[in-house]
Amino acid sequence: ASAGGGCRRGPSFSPGSIPSLAAERAPDPPLAMAGNVKKSSGAGGGGSGGSGAGGLIGLMKDAFQPHHHHHHLSPHPPCTVDKKMVEKCWKLMDKVVRLCQNPNVALKNSPPYILDLLPDTYQHLRTVLSRYEGKMETLGENEYFRVFMENLMKKTKQTISLFKEGKERMYEENSQPRRNLTKLSLIFSHMLAELKGIFPSGLFQGDTFRITKADAAEFWRKAFGEKTIVPWKSFRQALHEVHPISSGLEAMALKSTIDLTCNDYISVFEFDIFTRLFQPWSSLLRNWNSLAVTHPGYMAFLTYDEVKARLQKFIHKPGSYIFRLSCTRLGQWAIGYVTADGNILQTIPHNKPLFQALIDGFREGFYLFPDGRNQNPDLTGLCEPTPHFS
């Protein structure tokens, strides 16, 4: 459920032209932006990088900033979804798009690009609704869809209030409110990639979703059967039995890495992404601790452009590098590094776990200084099998 790179500025919502779902027969949507069906720019996030603070605290500090509504960890059951709720959500999405279209905001057209993401999300939801025409009750009772719609509503409202509170600071590219807008854009892109993964071509297939790594798939099947989505608390308890979580602090940091859509639930899609990123399964949490929690090169919720900007400081220190979840290919890593001739490149390692790519890159002289620091963590211990906890 990931898609390729190039983003372009798509046609957008035309204000006030949200279609009534009652007249949902028309194959061509009245929205100006509805023709904008293109590859989703999935995105990455969740960890210790952006603020420069490392460790568990840094991991959470960075991941938690944009969503201040997270006081509860046991979510209430999501409300039932009907057409009225979907239409209301579209109006909010429309409002967000109009706020982001303000020429003073001057958003860069690169992933994650909210002016593509929200129209694409609208488009995919239209496809879903057309597939469930006359069966809206089935859709409205689908737990995944209910959680998704409630989260979409929350995140759009949050974005609107960000503009309200940020005022003119929304026009400054390096302000904190703008950083939060980028994080929300990443969350929207994770949500879209997930929706397309669970409802490919508009039909629910969450119960047959294929988890890439066999041992991770076996864990999910044993713990949750055919469930598509489980509350964070249930997930944490099940995972703890196989991979012990050492503290409440570690649990919260783990949540900030795996809960890509920031809704207090873990979906089979998010679990698949996480287990691909931090493979192998046998040492999952050890890998995560070494690569995310304690590694100075790991960047949370950072985009391609932000990586370039961050490495600019180390342009005279070839071998400086940082890494993030790939924006365009969820489940893969992107490593940014400074070359000997003073260029900044970003590469996606294929067919090997991240720690192996970092070890190889260190030996070859490419990845020497994580976030410009002289001390590079030794990851060779991750090559050895984990002492297994039964």
Swiss-Prot record:
GO molecular function: calcium ion binding; phosphotyrosine residue binding; receptor tyrosine kinase binding; SH3 domain binding; ubiquitin protein ligase activity
Chain intervals for the UniProt region annotation (4H): 77-205
Matching InterPro entries: Adaptor_Cbl, Adaptor_Cbl_EF_hand-like, Adaptor_Cbl_N_dom_sf, Adaptor_Cbl_N_hlx, Adaptor_Cbl_SH2-like, Cbl_PTB, EF-hand-dom_pair, SH2_dom_sf
Composition bias type Gly residues, residue spans: 42-52
Keywords: Calcium, Metal-binding, Oncogene, Repeat
Region annotated SH2-like, chain positions: 279-381
Ranges in coiled-coil conformation: none
Xref: CDD domains: SH2_Cbl-b_TKB
Binding site for Ca(2+): D259, T261, N263, Y265, E270
BP terms from Gene Ontology: cell surface receptor signaling pathway; regulation of signaling
Residues binding 4-O-phospho-L-tyrosine, per UniProt: R324
Top-level taxon of origin: Viruses
Annotated Pfam families: Cbl_N, Cbl_N2, Cbl_N3
Region listing for Disordered, in residue ranges: 1-52
One cellular component (GO) term of this entry: plasma membrane
Ranges for region EF-hand-like: 206-278
Domain Cbl-PTB: residue ranges: 77-381
Other known facts: This protein is synthesized as a Gag-Cbl polyprotein.
Domain writeup: Is composed of the phosphotyrosine binding (PTB) domain, a short linker region and the RING-type zinc finger. The PTB domain, which is also called TKB (tyrosine kinase binding) domain, is composed of three different subdomains: a four-helix bundle (4H), a calcium-binding EF hand and a divergent SH2 domain.
Protein task: Induces early B-lineage lymphomas.
Protein name as catalogued: Transforming protein cbl
Protein source organism: Cas-NS-1 murine leukemia virus
Gene: V-CBL
